[in-house]
Design a protein with these regions (language model features):
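Bacterial N-terminal signal peptides that target proteins for export
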Residues: 2-15
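Ser/Thr-rich, Proline-interspersed low-complexity disordered segments
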Residues: 29-112
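C-terminal active-site subregion of NodB/CE4 polysaccharide deacetylases
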Residues: 46, 51-52, 64, 87-88, ...
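Histidine-centered catalytic micro-motifs
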Residues: 118, 183, 236-244
């Protein structure tokens, strides 16, 4: 190679290197990757690390992909847990849907049973200006306790209306000398005076309330909280209609309104539908019986005097009226009568 040719080649080589250096200098700018001659790692300017570096981008995508899997697994789990905690059921417990239990299926055997059903109203002393009706319906707490003492001493056993029905329909055995205690109208003194005495003597009564009067919180009548307390302690409740009308000769629509209104009001507060209706003032008719029977009631109570019952008369049960003038001895004589 001639000296001139060698010089020309050197010049070209130098110019080539200068061109490469210029290109690299022009392309490299802030945030672009540079190769570390010592570590061989990728370095990225903080402001552009994610956007411009390939490996971090791939790394973030992998994290996102990894995170997406737990998201699909964890989020539904967390959501279902929250729902299970905050919304356990559609209906709050313990007042679940009110139960409506069908009555016992008759076994086909005709039975006649003698079971006195005592009928009380007020358990309190009548006010000084009370009329003759109020005085007649008022049994003082002292009288009432004497009545309960007499029942115990004379060997009577307090049963429920349900017990009577099962005995008539299926022959369920009753204790000797059974008797049933009923209270009409739902007066407040039934809670303040009768209820404590019934607990003392370990007895149960049937209380027939006028549901609209309770809803309206009428003075002198039990409240729902009092009724709930008594029911929780084992006392029984039935309907005395919505507003104490004469149920005889009314249209079916009106009777349905009365039957279902009284029934649903008690079910809402006690968790079960009442089984028994006490006809207001003892006034009822054939259509009354038919409607209350179709509404799921098990039977009805009248104000007619008597102590003998059959299954055919379960919607016309007779009772023994207890008056304000009756002593324990008077009650004993009433219980012994063969009505």
């Amino acid at each position: 190679m001639t000296r001139g040719a060698f010089g020309l080649m050197c010049v070209r080589t130098i110019l080539g290197w200068l061109l490469v250096a210029a290109l690299m200098s022009g392309c490299a700018g802030p945030g672009q990757p540079t190769i570390s001659p010592d570590l061989g790692e990728t370095r990225v300017a903080p402001s552009a690390r994610v956007l411009l570096t390939v490996e971090p981008t791939v790394t973030l995508m992998a994290i996102a992909s990894t995170a997406s899997t737990p998201t699909a697994t964890l989020w539904p789990t967390a959501t279902s847990t929250a729902i299970a905690t905050l919304l356990p059921t559609a209906t709050p417990s313990p007042t679940a849907s009110p139960t409506c239990t069908p009555g016992p299926t008759p076994d086909g055997v005709a039975r006649t049973l003698r079971v006195p059903i005592l009928m009380y109203h007020y358990i309190s002393s009548p006010p000084a200006d009370a009329d003759v009706y109020r005085r007649d319906l008022s049994v003082t707490p002292a009288q009432f306790e004497n009545h309960l003492k007499y029942l115990v001493d004379a060997g009577y056993h307090v049963i429920t209306l349900d017990d009577l029905l099962y005995a008539l329909a299926q022959g369920r055995e009753l204790p000797t000398q059974p008797v049933i205690l009923t209270f009409d109208d739902g007066y407040e003194d039934n809670f303040t005076n009768a209820f404590p005495l019934l607990r003392t003597y370990n007895m149960v009564g049937h209380f027939f309330v006028i549901s609209d009067f309770v809803n309206q919180e009428r003075p002198g009548y039990m409240t729902w909280s009092q009724i709930e307390e008594m029911a929780a302690a084992g006392q029984r409740f039935g309907s005395h209609s919505r507003d104490h009308p004469n149920l005889n000769g009314k249209s079916d629509d009106y009777l349905v309104w009365q039957a279902l209104g009284g029934k649903e009001a008690l079910a809402e507060h006690l968790g079960q539908h009442p089984h028994w209706i006490s006809y207001p003032a003892g006034q009822y008719g054939d259509r009354t019986i038919a409607v209350y029977k179709s509404a799921g009631y098990w039977g009805g109570l009248t104000t007619q005097q008597g102590t003998t019952h059959t299954l055919d008369d379960i919607f016309e049960l007779q009772r023994v009226r207890v008056r304000g003038s009756h002593t324990a001895e008077d009650l004993g004589r009433l219980l012994e009568l063969d009505w």
